[in-house]
Curated annotation (Swiss-Prot):
This is Trace amine-associated receptor 6. The keyword Transmembrane applies. Its main location: membrane. The keyword Cell membrane applies. Belongs to the G-protein coupled receptor 1 family. Residues 1-32, 90-107, 169-202, 277-282 are extracellular. Pfam families: 7tm_1 (PF00001). GO terms for biological process: adenylate cyclase-activating G protein-coupled receptor signaling pathway; G protein-coupled receptor signaling pathway. The gene is Taar6. Keywords: Cell membrane, Disulfide bond, G-protein coupled receptor, Glycoprotein, Membrane, Receptor, Transducer, Transmembrane, Transmembrane helix. It comes from Rattus norvegicus (Rat).
């Protein structure tokens, strides 16, 4: 009498014939191709979109401003996420294996954390910049100079790189979790297990700047509403050239603040699920299913691809700069001094 039971599934390993290899749990062909397309598109957009932002701001002299230099540096951080983090995380997420070695796993994790915090620092300084620009637009050029912007950029790179290097190359993040760490660190894996103390520090490092940005942008839009009422009042009277100039400057700064406010909101929405998930896992015993964790991770990664899309939607100068770059006009000697703004202020 024949048996109806199916043969047992063959256990797949990341490295066949290697002791201590991680178990491989690959997707079926259809979802696998779809995931490579979705994740790959995000990586390509993060690389080339942010490269366009950097080229635009650094090439066109009209865009050389303290705020735009901060935006270019933010784009640089997102660019490196697309180059050094997303492609390798894509393979790990889809193949459920890490094929790039233990040393590169540590380097990859450092880059992941450093560029995330670099983005957060940049957005915090941009929020301060916009707050000063909107609340005191005429004094702003003397307060937030290119030199000040350079200091902010330096801080936004040096502190995150030093922090991530110190934490992940010393191994302090796993103190007290040696047994758990040994259990998940099989050959072909790149899972970082972080103890409660460091997860709490990371969460507060995300939460505190986020709350500061929310407060700053809340004040920005309150001031913007007051300015709009004043401009409407002035518009109903015979306005002097000085009042007209103030109104145009205020209008420009409000528009810039709105666009960058959207960028901040996008960052918060992208990173909040991952931050909460990390906190829950650390204090609840790593209970999050793998697929939920991957969704949270890739929501965070996709933030690096979103900023160029936001700029393209809300910044006419960026659209024009893209056309000039893609058409090859950027190689003309006169392109650096080209006017990218349709209206004068």
């Amino acid at each position: 009498m024949g048996s109806n039971s199916s043969p047992p599934a063959v256990l797949q390993l990341c490295y066949e014939n290697v002791n201590g290899s991680c178990v491989k749990t690959p997707y079926s062909p259809g979802p696998r191709v779809l995931l490579y397309a979705v994740f790959g598109f995000g990586a390509v957009l993060a690389v080339f979109g942010n490269l366009l932002v950097m080229i635009s701001i650094l090439h066109f002299k009209q865009l050389h401003s303290p705020t735009n230099f901060l935006i270019a540096s933010l784009a640089c951080a997102d660019f490196w996420v697309g180059v050094s983090v997303m492609p390798f995380s894509m393979v790990r997420s889809i193949e459920s294996c890490w094929y790039f070695g233990r040393s590169f796993c540590t380097f990859h994790t450092c880059c992941d954390v450093a560029f995330c915090y670099s983005s957060l620092f940049h957005l915090s300084f941009i929020s301060i910049d916009r707050y000063i620009a909107v609340t005191d637009p005429l004094v702003y050029p003397t307060k937030f100079t290119v030199s000040v912007s350079g200091i902010c950029i330096s801080i936004s790179w040096i502190l995150p790189l030093a922090y991530s290097g110190a934490v992940f190359y010393t191994g302090v993040y796993a103190d007290g979790l040696e047994e758990v760490s040994d259990a998940v660190n099989c050959v072909g894996g790149c899972q970082v297990v972080v103890n409660q103390n460091w997860v709490l520090i990371d969460f507060l490092s995300f939460l505190i700047p986020t709350l500061v940005m929310i407060i700053l942008y809340g004040n920005i839009f309150l001031v913007a509403r007051q300015q709009a009422k004043k401009i409407e009042t002035v518009g109903n009277k015979a306005e002097s050239s000085s009042e007209s100039y103030k109104a145009r400057v205020a209008r420009r700064e409000r528009k810039a603040a709105k666009t960058l406010g959207i960028t901040v909101v996008a960052f918060m929405i992208s990173w909040l699920p991952y931050s909460i998930d990390s906190l829950v896992d650390a204090f609840m015993g790593f209970i999050t299913p793998a697929y939920i964790y991957e969704i949270c991770v890739w929501c965070a990664y996709y933030n690096s691809a979103m900023n160029p899309l936001i700029y393209a939607l809300f910044y006419p100068w960026f659209k024009k700069a893209i056309k000039v770059i893609m058409s090859g006009q950027v190689f003309k000697n006169s392109s650096a001094t080209m006017n990218l703004f349709s209206e004068q202020i």
